[in-house]
């Protein structure tokens, strides 16, 4: 009897671990492994890290979790097809994994602009079932949907909700930066008319944006206003983590000029170009008591000029103009250490260098302006017709980049070598759905192109660059170009001004020289507010060549003026009073 009992106990000892193992296995299938719970937390690694884990992991549940983490991060890296591929591989998910998958799918829909689908997917998710990290992702998707609909205020409100569930400082900073970007891109009138409805955080953001916009061109006042705001909203998220764009204002010092070095080619074949720019620069600074030292870059090397300027105690330089000299500085930034430099050109090698900005009349500015203008005019399938040369390639690249930002697709680009190629380029590039054409051509070529387009589709919206604007355009030519729009510098808006008539006479009505004069004029405006321009986000200068602002690497960006041929005359379009009469010569 005793032996039988002992055998029974031995059997229990043998089977008990097995039973426990099966029980635990059942719990894992039902509840998921402890690693699955990591889906409730932030995914802080790169997609490459999670993809490597997928390749190394044998456990099926953990493998599914790593695929979800990889897909989540791939969406934030804008690698949507890869994310979708990992989601498609998932099988036999537990409840925690299904929940996280639904969040990722909603995020993908929002990124793709499928707003209704994303909203429906979110409606199936119960907020109470989400962890704080997952709730922050939920509201990020809500914000993205609102952004897709150009409803910045709703996007900001969602970002405020998102902030409540963020614990990581870096993520909070990123969220504040994005909230601030939305505020900066919202029309001032919309901000002023938005009711915070008792939401103290929203009220703080709106007030911050309004104060910033109101004091943008008064830097000293702006800094004091920001300090006052922080005292009024001491517990606000932005008071603890000021948007990155605003953090540099604490060290801002107003521009003070005593001596300036102006570097231009003033002899040889480029003398006329250099002298015209200098004339504009001199006219702009006429009322300022600042000593200007002029250096001829055709007689001295750029290294010699910089060394000479330093010996003379000059710490601010305008120039050089020639690209090879700009490249010398770009490749040897130590040359201009401790100097403020406004280069009057840019090159493909241009990069961010402390206290250096690049300014020039580049075709990229016009191409980007054209893409934005066509988008605003509801053009969605444009054809871009450009010459097969450096100008054409630069224009095409800049237009395509801007179009991708606006619509997420490439623009249809067609090149031509000579006038005889234009007819073929147009017929091969146009489709029934094409609704606008951007043309880079001279005045004569433009007329020929328009004649072809009028025969193919007279309803197309036509746009051109300043290259086609010529003083030789008579009434008949202007009438033929009726309704065509083109970009140019705002200096051409008022031909009756004393300044215009003076420069018209000085340059013998040569438009290319008038552009250079305007560039020289604006070079003074820029260097005279150089610190403000570089350090205050959104700071703009209304110049003769456009509304000037600092872009990436401190490339000076120009907001162009658009004109239109109407019944033999030319009118500026982006003015409040479009009835301004510009040209009507008989």
Curated annotation (Swiss-Prot):
Membrane topology: Lipid-anchor
One annotated GO molecular function: enzyme regulator activity
Domain of life: Bacteria
BP terms from Gene Ontology: peptidoglycan biosynthetic process; regulation of cell shape
A GO cellular component entry from the record: periplasmic side of cell outer membrane
Record lipid sites (S-diacylglycerol cysteine): 27
Cited Pfam families: LppC (PF04348)
Protein's cellular compartments: Cell outer membrane
The keyword Cell membrane belongs to this UniProt entry's keyword annotation: no
Keywords: Cell outer membrane, Cell shape, Lipoprotein, Membrane, Palmitate, Peptidoglycan synthesis, Signal
Lipidation (N-palmitoyl cysteine): 27
Signal peptide span: 1-26
Primary residence: membrane
Subunit structure: Interacts with PBP1a.
Function statement: Regulator of peptidoglycan synthesis that is essential for the function of penicillin-binding protein 1A (PBP1a).
Family label: Belongs to the LpoA family.
Name of the protein in its database record: Penicillin-binding protein activator LpoA
Encoding gene (name): lpoA
């Amino acid at each position: 009897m005793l032996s039988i009992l002992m055998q029974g106990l031995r059997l229990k000892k043998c089977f008990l671990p097995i039973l426990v193992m099966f029980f635990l296995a059942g719990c894992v299938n039902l509840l998921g492994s402890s690693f699955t719970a990591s889906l409730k937390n932030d995914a802080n690694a790169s997609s490459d890290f999670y993809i490597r884990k997928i390749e190394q992991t044998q456990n099926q549940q953990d493998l599914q979790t790593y695929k979800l983490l990889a897909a989540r991060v791939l969406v934030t890296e804008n690698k949507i097809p890869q994310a979708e591929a990992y989601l498609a591989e998932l099988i036999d998910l537990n409840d925690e994994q299904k929940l996280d998958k639904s969040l990722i799918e909603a995020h993908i829909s929002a990124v793709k602009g499928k707003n209704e689908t994303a909203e429906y997917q979110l409606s199936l998710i119960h907020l109470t079932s989400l962890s704080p990290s997952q709730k922050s992702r939920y509201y990020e998707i809500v914000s993205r949907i609102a952004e897709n609909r150009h409803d910045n205020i709703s996007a900001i409100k969602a970002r405020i909700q998102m902030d409540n569930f963020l614990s990581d400082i870096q993520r909070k900073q990123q969220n504040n930066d994005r909230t601030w970007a939305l505020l900066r891109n919202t029309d001032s009138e919309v901000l002023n008319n938005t009711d915070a409805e008792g939401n103290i955080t929203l009220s703080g953001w709106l007030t911050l944006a309004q104060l910033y916009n109101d004091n943008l061109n008064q830097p000293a006042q702006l800094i004091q206003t920001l300090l006052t705001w922080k005292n009024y909203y001491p517990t606000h998220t932005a008071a603890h983590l000021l948007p990155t764009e605003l953090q540099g204002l604490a060290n801002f010092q107003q521009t003070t000029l005593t001596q300036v070095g102006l570097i231009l080619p003033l002899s040889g074949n480029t003398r006329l170009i250099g002298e015209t720019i200098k004339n504009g620069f001199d006219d702009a600074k006429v009322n300022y008591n600042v000593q200007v030292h002029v250096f001829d870059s055709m007689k001295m090397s750029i290294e010699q000029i910089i060394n000479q300027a330093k010996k003379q105690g000059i710490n601010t330089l305008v120039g050089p103009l020639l690209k090879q000299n700009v490249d010398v500085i770009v490749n040897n930034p130590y040359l201009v250490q401790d100097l403020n430099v406004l280069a009057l050109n840019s090159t493909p090698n241009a990069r961010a260098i402390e206290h250096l900005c690049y300014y020039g009349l580049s075709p990229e500015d016009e191409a980007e302006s054209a893409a934005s203008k066509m988008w605003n005019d509801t053009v969605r399938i444009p054809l871009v017709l450009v010459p097969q040369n450096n100008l054409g390639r630069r224009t095409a690249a800049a237009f395509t980049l801007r179009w991708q930002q606006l619509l997420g697709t490439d623009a249809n680009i067609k090149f031509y070598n000579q006038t005889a190629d234009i007819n073929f380029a147009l017929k091969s590039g146009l489709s029934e759905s094409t609704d606008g054409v951007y043309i880079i051509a001279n005045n004569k070529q433009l007329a020929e192109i328009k004649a072809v387009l009028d025969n193919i589709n007279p309803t197309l919206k036509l746009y051109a660059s300043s290259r086609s604007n010529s003083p030789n355009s008579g009434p008949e030519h202007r009438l033929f170009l009726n309704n065509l729009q083109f970009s140019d510098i705002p200096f051409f808006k008022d031909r009756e001004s004393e300044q215009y008539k003076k420069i018209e006479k000085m340059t013998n009505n040569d438009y290319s020289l008038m552009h250079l004069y305007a560039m020289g004029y604006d070079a003074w405006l820029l260097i005279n507010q150089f610190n403000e321009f570089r350090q205050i986000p959104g700071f703009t200068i209304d110049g003769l060549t456009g509304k000037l602002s600092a872009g990436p690497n401190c490339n000076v960006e120009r907001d162009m003026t658009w004109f239109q041929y109407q019944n033999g005359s030319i009118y500026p379009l982006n003015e409040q009073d479009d009835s301004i009469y510009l040209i009507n010569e008989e």
